């Protein structure tokens, strides 16, 4: 299937127009005018992501966070981030970025996180249009902040979790409302 057809189907669900102003989204590296047998989906593109894509013979990576965020001043291979871009180009791997639009879209990442964490009766954290918004605020069963943090850690398989509190006792504070 053409990469452009894959992206057309993806954008039928999650259009770029949902992206927040100034956000990087869409094709960032390569071309969509090529046949693709395998697609890799990633949160970030790191060296290992590129190795995995090459080994799997993936012709397209759909990624949440853009591999090129600031303008490149050069494209020399002795810089790790540049080497990633060079390897993607060398192996003809296209990169399509879907950042805030996958957060905003109904049943996107924000809604999925709420589902995983049993967050109910949600509303938008910030309205982005008449029908959409980024982030979610909702209700959870009453529990301590520490218990909810442990649930987040377990749900996402995290080794550690950074929590910002005013006092150590905040971990024992009861909460019923959270934001994603």
Language-model regions, residue ranges each:
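Hydrophobic structural segments
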Residues: 1-180
